[in-house]
Regions:
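Non-cytosolic membrane-interface motifs at loop->transmembrane helix junctions
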Residues: 32-40, 92-104
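Membrane-helix boundary connector in multi-pass membrane proteins
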Residues: 83-98, 116
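Juxtamembrane membrane-water interface segments of multi-pass membrane proteins
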Residues: 2-3, 25-30, 51-68, 87-90, ...
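Core segments of alpha-helical transmembrane spans in multipass integral membrane proteins
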Residues: 14-22, 34-62, 71-82
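A generic hydrophobic-segment detector
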Residues: 102-135
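Hydrophobic alpha-helical segments of small multi-pass membrane proteins
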Residues: 43, 67-84, 99-113
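N-terminal signal-anchor transmembrane alpha helix
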Residues: 4-28
Length: 135
């Protein structure tokens, strides 16, 4: 699990870097609202994925769910942002229905976040939940 989380952290770093590159592209080379939105989308979801990776390490019983949410957010933001950027630069799509697929992965990722957080509060069968013992 730890290697998977480290891989997600590395991918989040690359996603954040790509978001910054798109921000610079929007500011200096190709001022287009689609490029700006793609940059913002990548930056926001890179940070969210980093936070989810931290939660995955802190809540080991539910860590796989937090890591899955991070993976869905990163893949969704990559597909969605690439499609928007290609439309701005070349007037072409990444592939048919790429933006809806990317958006659906983003929605799924956020739903997994919600379910994972709620499940962390519930006790596991025969044990306690991952939540802190403080009341």
């Amino acid at each position: 699990m730890r290697k998977w989380i480290c891989t997600l952290v590395a991918l989040a770093g690359l996603t954040g870097a790509a978001g910054m590159i798109l921000s610079a592209t929007d500011a200096h080379l190709l001022p287009d609202i689609r490029v700006q939105r793609a940059a913002n989308l990548m930056l926001i979801h890179a940070v969210a994925a980093l936070a989810l990776c931290g939660l995955a390490l802190l809540a080991p019983r539910r860590g796989g769910w937090f890591a899955s949410a991070a993976g869905a957010l990163l893949s969704g933001s990559l597909i969605f942002a690439c499609d928007m950027t290609l439309r701005a630069v070349h007037g072409a799509r990444l592939f048919p229905m790429a933006a809806p697929l990317g958006g659906s992965l983003l929605i799924l990722g956020w739903i997994i976040v919600t379910i994972s957080a709620a499940a962390t509060l519930w006790p596991s069968p025969g044990g306690t939940g991952d939540q802190n013992t403080e009341k």
